Amino acid sequence: MNRKNIIGIPIKNLKEPMSRLDSTLDKNQRISLQIGLIKNLAECFRSKDNDIFLISNDSEIEKLANQLEINFFNAKSVGLNKEVIEFSKNFKNYQGWMICHSDLPYVTKYFAKTIIQEIEGSEILIAKSKDSGTPFIAGSISFDEFRFGVKSFDKHSKYLKENKFEYKQIY
């Protein structure tokens, strides 16, 4: 373990990214936007203390990781939750971990630094989106019960409460 934190950014592929915007942006615009958001995440979290990984089983995502000079986790599993659970086996090698959606538009270097500091003092940090999704979840303890999908924040928080994890909701 050379670095303190591991950050995973799951992304299926670039074939139909951000499909919820298909009535506003054409496919090439959505691909450019998705790549731009991933680049921003990589730059904001890039530091001597963080190992950043794109999580996927798509060769185009591996090429993108190489272009961005970040790590690639080649998931053997299929499906977001299974891929992230597989990736989470690496958490034990780090003091802190974070799973972050690949399309977060509001991340800045200040935000990234603040989140990393918050991880150090928390078992679990979790964010809730307007649609009750989980744009990011992070922590300093072993965790592998990811429940992304519809109303994932509600599923995560229910699991955390039932299993008596201390967690802090931010944002």
Predicted regions and their residues:
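N-terminal nucleotide-binding beta1-loop-alpha1 segment
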Residues: 1-21
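Short glycine-enriched, charge-decorated loop/helix-capping segments at active-site entrances
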Residues: 21-29
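A short, N-terminal amphipathic alpha-helix
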Residues: 32-50
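Acidic donor-binding segment of Leloir-type glycosyltransferases
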Residues: 49-71
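Short phosphate-binding loop-to-helix
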Residues: 66-98
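The conserved acidic donor/metal-binding loop of glycosyltransferases
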Residues: 101-105
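Conserved donor-nucleotide/metal-binding helix-loop-beta segment in metal-dependent transferases, i.e.
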Residues: 107-132
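Active-site oxyanion/phosphate-handling segment shared across diverse enzymes
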Residues: 141-171
